[in-house]
Amino acid sequence: NEIKDNDIFVITQKIVSKSEGMERDLNKYEFEDLIKSETKQIIRKRGDLIIAKTKHGFICANAGIDKSNIEKNKALLLPEDPNKSAHKFRSQIETASGKRVAVVISDTFGRAWRKGQVNFAIGSSGISPITNYIGKYDSFNNELFATEIATIDEIASAAELVMEKSIDIPIAIIRGLKYESSNENAEILIRDDQEDFFL
């Protein structure tokens, strides 16, 4: 199928990191040292598991460094700048296709207080990250004061349903979803420390 205007490309972090040379040989690097190199702040530690705030501002296990779906004795770091990566991929797709598209880069994170993992957007380009309902009214005519939907996170999670970890499909296209184009990116989803009730 050919690319269409307003297609949303959801691209896994793994192929972005691999394409940008973020693979590390664990015969040459200690896994703990890699975590330290990517960590801004350690939030919690239990046994071998470290919950860390990365240089990007993400709070996740082992600073987002992954050893799954990759050769043995290898580790994969997050992209240096996932939003820049998303913009690069979007520019390449638009140049090649002549169509206007959006790009979301996804990665799998755990969640506090709930079991299981979901995909989140760690980078984006060409799509508003948040759908803001503040000041609008619900179906009972109640004014909404706090509802902001993390649209690109929902897109990343929806795409995971067809990408599937075990078969490792690296790209999904979401078509037919209405969205607002924007110059903002996934960075605006990161809550400032001063606003974070749990830090």
Where are these regions (language model features)?
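Disulfide-rich extracellular domains of secreted proteins
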Residues: 3-5, 16, 94-100, 132
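N-terminal, positively charged regions that mediate nucleic acid binding
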Residues: 1-27
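Phosphate-interacting basic helix/loop segments used at nucleotide- and nucleic-acid interfaces
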Residues: 1, 80-99
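A structural signal for small-residue-enriched, beta-sheet-centric alpha/beta enzyme cores
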Residues: 13, 23-73, 77, 101, ...
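Short beta-strands and strand-coil junctions in structured, solvent-facing domains, enriched
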Residues: 18, 96, 110-112
